Regions:
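Substrate-binding pocket helix/loop in short-chain dehydrogenase/reductase
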Residues: 63-64, 71-76, 181
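Active-site loop-to-helix junction immediately N-terminal to the catalytic Tyr of the SDR YXXXK motif
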Residues: 67, 113-121, 133, 161
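Active-site helix of classical SDR
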Residues: 87, 123
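Alpha-helical segment proximal to the catalytic Tyr-Lys
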Residues: 92, 136-137
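Residue(s) in the substrate-gating loop at a strand-loop-helix junction
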Residues: 107
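Short C-terminal tail/terminal secondary-structure segment
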Residues: 112, 200-201, 212-226
Length: 226
């Protein structure tokens, strides 16, 4: 959504992986026309598509009595059509691949809802349901469909909260460890961005060639469900 951040990320990747073929494009995943154009550009540039990773999301923090109708509708639209639009746009190219996969970045909220994020939890559960259904529908076309379920992962938002902390003597490691302990994360820390990325790489690649319809927990053991 932010062209400057996108350009910066692309520049960093090119510097780290000078031999890689990187195409950085911006589109609104809720705009089906933009997504279709994006899919055409990607397919034309690379000559085909083997994998699609859906990673559009945010959270609406509010209890039931503080959640307006607009928030319910937006959360449902973003979580569902943020996947539906890309899948519809890339499906023709994926059907031509011999190693095709679709992987959705979801949240542990899908199976473990929290009261203060009721709309987001419900939308995440709907996405997990749809992802499993897609895995059944697309397996006959040779397309695997899986998800990862994220717990608490280090991010820019957490860094901003750290900068605003009251105890300036706490290091980043101490501050995040305290959060993890309060929330009851068994591994006693937040996840690092590369950890869900590695899970995505596994599920999206032929390393997981016999896996479809799965939801891989990446939460440091924070899950409470069976």
């Amino acid at each position: 959504r932010d062209p400057d951040k996108l350009a910066g990320a692309a520049a960093s990747l090119r510097a780290e992986f000078p031999q890689a073929e990187i195409l950085a494009l911006r589109c609104d995943v809720l705009d089906a026309q933009q997504v279709a154009q994006f899919a055409d550009q990607v397919t034309a540039h690379f000559g085909g598509v083997d994998l699609l990773i859906n990673n559009a999301g945010q959270g609406f923090v509010a209890h039931f009595d503080q959640t307006p109708r607009e928030a319910w509708l937006h959360e449902a639209e973003l979580k569902l059509f943020g996947v539906i639009n890309p899948v519809q746009a890339f499906l023709p190219a994926l059907e031509r691949s011999t190693i095709a996969s679709i992987t959705c970045v979801n949240s542990l909220l899908a199976l473990q809802p929290e009261e203060h994020m009721i709309a987001t939890s419900a939308a995440r559960a709907a996405l997990l349901n749809m992802t499993l259904t897609l895995s059944k529908e697309l397996v006959g076309k040779g397309i695997r469909v899986n998800s990862i379920l994220l717990g608490m992962v280090e991010s820019g938002q957490w860094r901003r909260r750290f900068d605003e902390r009251s105890d300036k003597d706490q290091s980043w490691e101490q501050w995040t460890a305290a959060i993890a302990e309060r929330r009851g994360i068994p591994m006693k820390r937040l996840g690092k961005p590369q950890e869900p990325a590695q899970a995505l790489l596994f599920l999206a690649s032929p390393l997981a060639s016999f896996t479809t319809g799965a939801a891989l927990d990446v939460s440091g053991g924070f899950n409470r469900h069976v």
